[in-house]
Design a protein with these regions (language model features):
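Short active-site segment of divalent metal-dependent hydrolases/proteases
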Residues: 11, 160-161
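Active-site catalytic microenvironments for nucleophilic, acid-base chemistry
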Residues: 41, 45, 77, 143, ...
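Phosphate-handling substructures
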Residues: 76-138, 207-209
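Acidic, low-complexity terminal tails and accessory targeting/binding regions
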Residues: 91-103, 166-215
Length: 215
């Protein structure tokens, strides 16, 4: 079974340089255009002869608006419903949420220093740790991999997807070698509307952070 892991399109907070976490932020105009490009990508994917006998049978999304809006474009192109999975939510960034990244050091100097230390078990006040995020993301992808379908598209967030990938593959795969010494902190950032493929059982990383489908 193939999982196509998609980071949502650009959100308003991405554009503003603001910490989102689990705040329910909509897509920017550019993000909506990216989501439409993802709809075109999903049509090409389902029509490709090389995809046989793969069938995209399910589209899953985080409950957060920026992911649901992206998933809705994809699902509509495939004639499928969007199914929501709470475990795909982004990191709960606690007291950081809603603040501009540029203002964090001034507003929360001690907390930012601890977060940037790379301590996997440091819990942002009011939020969660990288270790908690990785465990949640990994368990969710493993659960979805057990579904009775040959292929699915999973729309989520950069933090939860990279944390889950680092947990599963960071010490084994060359594309994720940057995570070998400090998992969950040194993974390359996933681009908005990038596609990463996982093959199950395994998982085996087929591709990582692909953006060639975006204009």
């Amino acid at each position: 079974m193939l999982q196509y892991l998609v980071r949502h399109g650009e959100s308003v907070s991405n554009l503003e340089g603001r910490v989102q976490g689990q705040e329910d932020i909509e897509l920017s105009d550019f993000g909506r255009a990216q989501a439409r490009q993802m709809a075109d990508w999903s049509r090409r994917l389902s029509a490709s002869p090389s995809a046989a006998p793969l069938t995209i049978g399910e589209v899953w999304s985080s409950p957060l608006r920026r992911a649901r809006e992206t998933a809705a474009e994809i699902a509509a192109a495939l004639g499928l419903p969007v199914m929501v999975e709470e475990g795909l939510c982004e990191l709960h960034a606690g007291i950081f949420q809603g603040h501009l990244w540029a203002d964090l050091e001034t507003a929360f100097p001690d907390e930012v220093a601890q977060w940037r230390s790379g301590d996997m078990h440091y819990v942002i006040p009011g939020g969660e740790s990288r270790a908690q995020l990785a465990a949640r993301g990994r368990a969710t992808l493993e659960k979805l991999a057990g579904r009775d379908t040959s292929g699915m598209i999973v729309v989520a967030h950069g933090g939860v997807l990279t944390a889950a990938l680092g947990s599963m593959l960071g010490r084994e795969h060359p594309l994720l070698a940057a995570a070998a010494e400090r998992p969950f902190t040194k993974l390359p950032a996933l681009a908005n509307c990038s596609v990463t493929q996982l093959e199950w059982p395994g998982p085996r990383l087929v591709s990582f952070n692909e953006t060639g489908h975006l204009g």
